[in-house]
Amino acid sequence: MRTILNSILLMSLCSSATAPAMAINRANYDKKDANIHEEEASDSTRHQPLTESSVKLNEVVVTGLTGSQKLKQSPAPISFVSARQLEMQPSTNIIDAIAHQPGVSQITTGSGISKPVIRGLGYNRVVVVNDGIRQEGQQWGDEHGIEIAPASVHSVEILKGPASLMYGSDAMAGVLIFHSAPTLAKGDMRANFSTGYQTNNGLFDYSLNFAGNQGGFVWNTRYSGKMAHAYKNKYDGYVFGSSLREQAFSQLLGWNYRQGHSHLTLDYYHLTPGIVEGERDEKTGELEVPDGYDAKSYGKPMPYQQIHHYKAVLNNSWFLGDGNLKLLLGYQQNRRQEFEEEENPKECGLDFMLHTMNYDLHYLSPEMNGWKFSTGINGMWQQSINKGSEFLIPAYHLFDYGVFATMSKEIGKLNLSGGIRYDHRHLHSEALREEDDADSHSSDLNGSGLNAHESNDSFRFQAFKRSFEGVTGSIGLAYEILPDFNLKLNLARGFRAPNISELSSNGVHEGTQRYELGNTSLKPENSWQFDLGMDYSSPIISAELSLFANRINHYIYSEKLADENDQPVLINDTPAYQFTSGDARILGGEASIDIHPVEHLHFGNTFSYVNSVQLHQPSESKYLPFTPAPRWVSDVRYEFVCDGKTFDHLFVKLQMDCNLRQNHYFAVNDTETATPSYTLLNMYAGTDVKLHGKRLLSLYLSGENLTNRAYQNHLSRLKYLDVNQVTGRRGVYNMGRNFSIKIVVPIEL
């Protein structure tokens, strides 16, 4: 599962046809050291000169749907985000850092919590891969993000569209692959320090890194931290409950040898975000805050969450003749707690403990008559335990496996690839009886409705067992029509088993402002998606067009419940929602063009559009929930200095981020509402500072939402909080004007 980067070189070049940082496939310009270990090659040639023909993004080696291949040879749509791009982009979390990419959005809960969305699909439809294994941390929840520290990410691959072939259930929308930095060449030792500050919420972050390779023994140690007080905007002022604190530690230890490598990675991640409830004073309309509340405090306001994530991954790769055998074993422990009682601040309400064991074994066979084959098996075992005094989902056990085979062949200018996979998942949910609990409620297990008058001696959760299976695959081609013009076609089938929340949730908590009810009769989702892609590059223009059509059967979503008088059903004074399903069709695509008429000047434009329709439904339920609005991003970038004596890559960029009005929303019982359009003006600048020909530090400055525009993104969950009775505006608005500074200091030892 782990990407075979096979020697990626990250470097900065000032060229009219390229971005300031590119990942280059070393094999295209230097084959004399072909026996160098793949992990060392990227660094052992870091400072070697490249020819101009090498510096093309299409030469990046990516995972793809069928194994390692050049980006231009992958028929499926893939985006690559380099280390330099991540450095330059101010953000509050790793999903926020990549949400500017075409086709990628984020469901947000305030400024610090983001869930990834790819082409209108999110939650358990996006698989996140980190350290080679899929990240498992209660993805069904809205109110917490991805347990990955931004400082630990070196580059990102974004696979758009069904990727169940390699990653199994849940990869309906695509996959986010977060890569750590490659190990260094023998004899190298390096350190790195970075820090940053943002003015709106006082966000302060830092990262320390030390890596090396002595005689094949490799290590990479990183510690990072972050803290932020409440953010502010023009309408709400400081938003109580939006503060956060983050700490992360990672340690890689391993051995590189001629026949392969063995690496052990240990990760710890701790996040303490507040919970925005959005309650308002009816007379003033202002957000309610506790007495003596300091909006700029970095402390933990009540209520708040606490997330601990531990991970251990053993990554082995062995070269067997011309073949390659890979084995990954992983363990993850995720614990999420919610604290909400002022009287008992150490007593948590919800307390989830999730244990996950990951395994992945696959073999890449030697090339035979131009054909490349790989086969493998991967999956996971899970156990979830309820340790708190409140309950939302039952305790459960899960085991799944998937067996797959892939192939690819290059025939002149034509590249063919495809594969097939079988998945099986078994879920066993445990019963929970609550006695004398007036707050316990049950839903009909067949999803037919709500029974709010259950006896006090009742089951909160009924025990059940479900098994799901599916056959998926993909077939595609990439054809080089001209040296700088490529055509891509791909057809893929996706599969997703319902998650535990969709099947059997029965409860409410501070983070969602919803009482959610599951439905054990739900069927697995399956989809067919067709992709058409074209890209063109020249010294003056670079352009790309990617179109898709996706048909999903048994698409699962939640809808707001109403009584016979069309009034919202309330449980414990909280609106009730229940999961249901239907068939859906999603159409859309992304277009980008970068015009650079003169050296150092770039005029870029990207446009993303998604139209998500539920088939055979009336107008109020025609559109799927959480569909991102059409988005147009335009920027002008000028590089003033390239490879100067003191400054390098000195640039300024002006950006217009235009989100169009979203009139396509799921309107049943006011589950969603329309979202007005808005435009944000941003400005970015940066440079490398050199001393004696070497990079001393990198400095980045930015100003986002320069006009301090008050807006709500359509995917903001805070949009549906309390109504301001004074102004009539509903919910909490997104962050206002924000300036930031970031400094990165590399240290060669």
Give the positions of each predicted feature.
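Flexible loop and strand-edge segments within Gram-negative outer membrane beta-barrel domains
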Residues: 228-230, 240-242, 246, 260-321, ...
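Structural signature of Gram-negative outer-membrane beta-barrels, strongest in the C-terminal barrel
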Residues: 368-372, 378-380, 388-552
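Outer-membrane beta-barrel translocator/receptor signature
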Residues: 137-139, 152-154, 165-235, 242-249, ...
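Transmembrane beta-barrel wall of Gram-negative outer-membrane proteins
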Residues: 201-227, 237-276, 304-321, 367-368, ...
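Outer membrane beta-barrel strand-and-loop segments of large Gram-negative receptors
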Residues: 347-362, 517-523, 529, 538, ...
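C-terminal beta-signal and adjacent terminal beta-strands/loops
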Residues: 553-554, 558, 660-665, 687-749
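Short acidic/polar hinge/loop motifs at secondary-structure boundaries
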Residues: 133-160
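Gram-negative outer-membrane beta-barrel transporters
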Residues: 548-551, 569-662
